[in-house]
């Protein structure tokens, strides 16, 4: 016989269903479940006296014959494509199904088979997202990677060689020897990693050897001389090898203005870092490149969102990161030219309009790599408070705004860097790089981080306790982060030229080399999901005011933010 229960009781037992709404942490962002792929009355749940037991929700099917390795039950998926309740199957480290799990011998509508060889992760009342992708990493110290992972980031792309002065300032790994050494070190870390080589050269030879040596991208940085000649040469070589180019333009306008840089692009696709300009770039109007079809614009997180403290902290950060001397007037003027409250305020709004497509950190080099996800949602919340609902949303929910913002650190950087077939979203056929969150801690502190189908990190209580929850609770690496499980569940992204050669053998690495692809003519700003707007942008050279299609973009700095001190008292 059937039994009718209230929505609140159902949500407590199996998680929210269609029409239920969930607040994201302490923000004003509300999501509403669009669809429930499970079957009422046939839900699967693990535990004593629950459904997933032999002959009930668990079948006799072997893994060889189709039972999943792992099932995440009754999770609320939040992704660019939807906000959907479902069971999620993982097999051989890959997401193989999103739908209804159970035992097809006794249950209807089952498309995910639970067998004796299936493990269960309880997703009831939890939010499931794709692992984050931080595409602006200064590899200054290896300890960064653990901090990023514990925040929900599972893929990192950038450059550097450790705490050298070149790495403090620029995301470039120079030359094939350094690239090789960095890739060899990557076997120690349970995340996907990629190296950007130095793109500043006026002739192709040095760039080609870095690409063939394992770089998956090239980075043009003003501290190495981002001249029109270097830009043109770098993009020409990148076109030949199908890799992405990232650019930090000329703050001092020594070799040209923003118009000269755009001319050097020649309409070719390029990823523009910290497009607002506080992180570097043509002062005061680099932000204008966000209006171009061929530019994939991103932000770094220290300016996200604009608060009453943003301006004050930036000057000191900049002096340290770019090896400047405050006693030299020219160095001080260089620093001050980059920090403009008007363009930082406009950056908030351009994110909300979908004109700035991606979010990243700029780790330890004017950015906090453990806060990419936090600051994305702080920006979304600030814009909800200041600008109200987006036209695509209703009074009931902020679903479209949430989809827009989550795309900024998941699918869009994956598209920009040619790896979206493998990572970047919760979709079948992709690597199971997943993060499970309690709604009250969404965006701040994950419940569980899954990498390539294995749990690699989670908050864990005293290992000597009788149960897993007693204090002190710390984020800790799990079994998936050790031994050969680590190298089997994560990859190194590289160029097609490097992957096709003998690089893995020559370097003696265990991780699989995965080539990037389709990052040149095949993509443009239109490829940036929910973030493809190209308004005409103008910057007043005297006041620094920014206008989009003639409308002044301005907003007040935030006095208080969500996802902040109340979550970090201990």
UniProtKB/Swiss-Prot annotation:
Would I find Cytoplasm among this entry's keywords?
Answer: yes
Pathway listed for it? Answer: Nitrogen metabolism; urea degradation; CO(2) and NH(3) from urea (urease route): step 1/1
Q: What cofactor(s) does the depicted protein rely on?
A: Ni cation
Q: Where in the cell is it found?
A: Cytoplasm
Spell out which residues are annotated as carrying N6-carboxylysine: 219
Keyword vocabulary terms for this entry:
Cytoplasm, Hydrolase, Metal-binding, Nickel
Q: Where is the active site?
A: 322
What EC number(s) does this enzyme carry?
3.5.1.5
A Gene Ontology cellular component where this protein is annotated is:
cytoplasm
Binding positions for Ni(2+) 2 per the UniProt entry: 219, 248, 274
Family assignment from sequence similarity: Belongs to the metallo-dependent hydrolases superfamily. Urease alpha subunit family.
What protein name applies here?
Urease subunit alpha
What is this organism's lineage?
Bacteria, Pseudomonadati, Pseudomonadota, Alphaproteobacteria, Hyphomicrobiales
